[in-house]
Amino acid sequence: MKPLKEQKIAVLLGGTSAEREVSLTSGDAVLTALRNQGYDAHPIDPKEYPVAQLKEQGFERAFNILHGRGGEDGVIQGVLEQIGLPYTGCGVMTSALTMDKMRTKMLWKGFGLPIADMEIVTRDTVDELNPLEVVERLGLPLMVKPSREGSSVGLTKVNAVEELKNAVDLALTHDDTVLIEEWLSGIEMTVPVLDDQVLPAVQIIPEGEFYDYDAKYISDNTRYICPAPMSEESLQELQKLVKRAYDVVGCRGWSRIDVMTDANGNFRLVEVNTTPGMTSHSLFPKSAATVGYSFEQLVVKILELSA
């Protein structure tokens, strides 16, 4: 096989999801990093370019930095498999599964891994929703979120029983399945995994009550601590848990797993990002930097792991 530097590489960026802007920023950073190191990399936006024709245009490999639906949900992965183009990140099944928070959590739960207690509501069952019963079981506050939307789109913190129905209705505008979860009041962190190696956790301290879209991409007041401070014992437990969560859903190459702690300090798995952000605010590069990866080295490593 030709060395990677001699291959024509498509950097897939942009796309049509709610996270298009973030993907364009990530893609630009990845493209620059590859070109700076002598790779023959080209920006390809599936919104404007038929990805199914990449191979006949001489492309030999794809760096997928599309975020959200269409890019992280198995769709683009299926197209690339179909035309036989190796690509970065997770395969079709894992991408499709992890885009669906509810089914990801059901799988983790089936393997005995810890998740938040939750109720599942769909468009078909929303009329049967009994807010009082839900609050009795899960307590207050509650977190309501669509099962399939990234970048914290459609999230609501519910502080009173009478707010629950509106929060569910809002989330249902983004997806037909909604999760109502117990509020996790502990520490929020995200843990990158690169080539089966668990990298240092990043603790997230948002200015507001939770890590929403603004805190993720716009605010400079969100604080990050990496490595996240914890005892050696907790660190070992976290690394083991994250590696198991990564393996259970079948991740490959690179992914980022979000974890929170409950009021008693117990870890709870939240979700998987199979195409983590690679912007100046992004957490994967922050973490990788603490173990010696420059941004450019990280990008090349991810490319080398493509399959």
From Swiss-Prot:
Residue ranges of every copy of the ATP-grasp domain listed in the record: 105-304
GO MF annotation terms: ATP binding; D-alanine-D-alanine ligase activity; metal ion binding
Cofactor(s) annotated in UniProt: Mg(2+); Mn(2+)
GO BP of this protein: cell wall organization; peptidoglycan biosynthetic process; regulation of cell shape
Enzyme Commission designation: 6.3.2.4
Keywords per UniProt: ATP-binding, Cell shape, Cell wall biogenesis/degradation, Cytoplasm, Ligase, Magnesium, Manganese, Metal-binding, Nucleotide-binding, Peptidoglycan synthesis
Enzyme class: ligase
PROSITE patterns: ATP_GRASP, DALA_DALA_LIGASE_1, DALA_DALA_LIGASE_2
Statement: the UniProt record of this protein carries the keyword Nucleus: no
Binding site for Mg(2+) 1: 258, 271
Chain positions recorded as ATP binding sites: 135-190
Entry GO terms, CC: cytosol
Pathway: Cell wall biogenesis; peptidoglycan biosynthesis
Pfam family, one: Dala_Dala_lig_C
Residues that hold Mg(2+) 2 according to the record: 271, 273
Domain of life: Bacteria
Enzymatic reactions: 2 D-alanine + ATP = D-alanyl-D-alanine + ADP + phosphate + H(+)
Location(s) in or outside the cell: Cytoplasm
Function: Cell wall formation.
Entry's family note: Belongs to the D-alanine--D-alanine ligase family.
Name of this protein: D-alanine--D-alanine ligase
Organism listed in the record: Mannheimia succiniciproducens (strain KCTC 0769BP / MBEL55E)
Name of the encoding gene: ddl
